[in-house]
Amino acid sequence: EAYPYEASATRIESALFDDWETWDDEQFEIHQWVATGERLDRESFGRYRAEGGSIISHSRTEEMTLAAISHPLTMIASDGKLENGRGHPRSTGTYAKVLGRYVRELGVLDLMDALRRMTIAPAERLQQRAHSMTQKGRIRMGSDADLTIFNPDTVIDRSTYTEPDVPSEGIEYVLVNGVVVVDEGELVEGVRPGKPIRSLR
């Protein structure tokens, strides 16, 4: 699984950072506090770690991202989320960025391969643990009508690390379980037709 960004996100209190007090000063500069967008130093990292919260770590290069995205076994996915409009741009831009930048602009993937990596490949990977995934990632009679209608000539992400909640361009309609949740590029307020996906017990 990969998403098309050179930064990751996690909690600052994660065990990943248990050795932070031994870091050189420049190691702090790759970290960004989600709530304010500020880059951190030793003092602010220690203060926020005691407080707890989300952090973005700018720890990869575009070459690393290209290698991950183009690998034949890679699926395109993101577990990112927004809280009060703050978070990682992968929450809103992952799929549009792959389609706009890595398919249309760079030609790293062809369109059908990118769509496979976003839909049927993750569904097949997960269906052994969650039977309801057999109804995802497919357009056929009886499957869940989860559909995204986009313009391949214009689709692109617009969210950033400081404005992660900006909607992508070129996504005209989104249906979840057959219900329109994005209509002519605009979010339909108050509509929540999604259902939980539960693992097999």
Regions found by a protein language model. Give the residues of each.
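Divalent metal-coordination and catalytic microenvironments
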Residues: 1, 79, 114, 122, ...
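Active-site neighborhoods of metal-dependent hydrolases
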Residues: 2-111
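Acidic, glycine-enriched loop/beta-strand segments at the rims
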Residues: 55-59, 65, 106-113, 124-165
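Short, surface-exposed, low-complexity cationic segments
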Residues: 191-201
